[in-house]
Structure formats: C-alpha cells, structure tokens
C-alpha cells in the first residue's frame, strides 16, 4: 500500500506541476476592503508506519486588507499507543503545533494579454519556542491570457527555511472564472480544482492540494531537541460552496489525505528520519467575509 501511494504521489507531481494565482481557500471574491476568514478541519486516526497512531484537528484564523494577509493555524494531535512510536522513543511526539504567517501579494498588467504577480510570505512554525522557526517564501511570475476564458501562468516559488529549502517552478492554467455558471477549472501546483456552479449562490468542487509545513520542535522534544519536523501531504476532497451574497462564502466538504509523511531534522537542519502515515479521511468547514 505504501508503494502504491508513493507512485500516486509521483503521478500527482507530474500532472499538477503548475500554480494557481488565486489561493485555494480564497476569500469571498477577494475584495480590496478588510476581510476575515475561519476554517476548521478534523482528520480520522491514521497509523504511523513505525508504531502508534494519531488523529488531528486544525483551526485557522486569517485577516487581510488589500495586499496584506495575516494568518494563524493551530493543529492539535491526539496520539494513541505513543509508546510504540519509535519517532519519539516511546513518548508523545507533540500535542500542538502552531503556524503564523504574514503574506504580501501584488499583481498588475504589462499589456492587454500579459499580467504579472509577485509576493512574499513570512512563516513561523513551532511547537513551543518561536526562536529559529522562521521561513521565507518569495514568488513571482507572469500570466498570459490566450482567450477571454483561458489564462496560463509561469513563474517560480522559493522557500528559504532552517531545513530543506527548495525552489519550485510554477506552471499552470486557469479556464473560466469561478463565478461563471457551469464548469470552470484551475489546474496547477500546489492546488488544483474543477468546479461546477449551479447559480450565484451554490457551487460544487473537486479539488486536490499539496501541502508542506515546517515546525521548530521544543528544546526538550522527545523527537529532536531544538530540531524540526516537516509535514508533507497530498489531500483531495469534494466541497459545496454557498455564497448567499458577494461578501460571504461558506464551504463544507469531505477530504482524503491519501499520502502523508513526517521528516525529522536536527537543530542544524540535517535530516534524521522519515515516517509515513496511513491514509485518513476528514471533514472541513470554512467561512470567509469581506467588506
């Protein structure tokens, strides 16, 4: 089963190598005024390949104004049979992980058919100590409008982090606007979706996304003292979006975390181990409001 999901992950990378300029959990039509959002999601218990299991609950709060967005995410873990978990030598690996982010996003046009986009995200992921937890993620690229309904994106995304820095190409396309009736699509990396809008208020979506988060572990962590854990996953889901008016958007859905791994690094950023988890299912609720 692990080999199967490893192959599926490789296929996912090949098919979804691209970018969505619009974030996967967008605010209600991204108004220029103040905007606020909340989402919560819970995942069922998943077995760890070297012992133990856990379930996870996430809560995210975010606020923004024009080009600036500030967000906080809290992830709570419920471990079972942690004594069998070799990742932490018989102790609970961690109970809660936190992530703060500040994002600045800009865009403009070069001509009638070419737009530009750029941005920078400052991220702090940690268990209890915020020191040595900061990462920086710049991005930039161009969007080319081939037809009124078809747009292509080309750019690059970087991640400068205490462990496992990376540079990724951004290539993707966008077909029709999500506010249009009927089918629309945004295919790319790190998220992709196909949507069908029934009317101004109701739409359904099939979506998939790749996520990667890095957390600085506590000074006395049983996993890696002053080290880091990198959590990487591929999540797919089916969602219903309800937009009673332009400034409010509500989303409910179910998700499958088909591939999920943890990589542990020491305090110098050197890799110590990798742990895979079995698939798990989850439920999602999101709400966003903009003025």
Give each language-model segment a name.
Residues 29-135, 226-236:
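Transmembrane beta-barrel domains of bacterial outer-membrane proteins
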Residues 41-49, 75-86, 109, 121-129, ...:
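Sequence/structural signature of outer-membrane beta-barrel proteins
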Residues 48-54, 94-96, 126-134, 158-167, ...:
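Solvent-exposed loop/turn segments connecting transmembrane beta-strands
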């Amino acid at each position: 089963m692990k080999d199967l999901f490893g192959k599926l992950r490789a296929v996912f990378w090949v098919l979804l190598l691209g970018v969505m300029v619009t974030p996967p959990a967008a605010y209600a039509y991204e108004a220029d005024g103040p905007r606020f959002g909340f989402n919560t999601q819970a995942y069922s218990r998943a077995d760890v390949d070297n012992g133990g299991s856990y379930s996870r609950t996430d809560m995210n709060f975010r606020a923004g104004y024009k080009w600036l967005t500030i967000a906080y995410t809290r992830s709570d873990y419920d471990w079972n049979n942690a004594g069998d978990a070799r990742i932490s030598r018989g102790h609970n690996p961690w109970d809660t992980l936190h992530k703060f982010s500040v994002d600045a996003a800009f865009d403009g046009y070069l001509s009638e058919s070419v737009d530009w986009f750029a941005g920078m995200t400052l991220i702090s992921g940690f268990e209890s100590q915020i020191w040595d937890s900061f990462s920086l993620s710049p991005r930039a690229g161009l969007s080319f409008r081939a037809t009124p309904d078809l747009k292509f994106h080309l750019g690059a995304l970087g991640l400068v982090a205490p462990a496992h820095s990376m540079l990724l190409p951004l290539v993707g396309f966008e077909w029709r606007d999500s506010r249009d009736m009927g089918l629309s699509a945004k295919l790319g990396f790190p998220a992709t979706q196909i949507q069908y809008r029934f009317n101004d208020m109701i739409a359904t979506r099939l979506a998939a996304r790749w996520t990667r988060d890095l957390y600085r572990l506590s000074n006395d962590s049983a996993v890696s003292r002053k080290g880091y854990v990198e959590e990487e996953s591929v999540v797919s889901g089916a969602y219903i979006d309800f937009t009673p008016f332009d400034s409010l958007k509500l989303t409910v859905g179910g998700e499958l975390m088909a591939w999920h791994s943890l990589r542990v690094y020491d305090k110098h950023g050197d890799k110590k181990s990798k742990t895979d988890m079995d698939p798990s299912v989850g439920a999602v609720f999101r709400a966003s409001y903009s003025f």
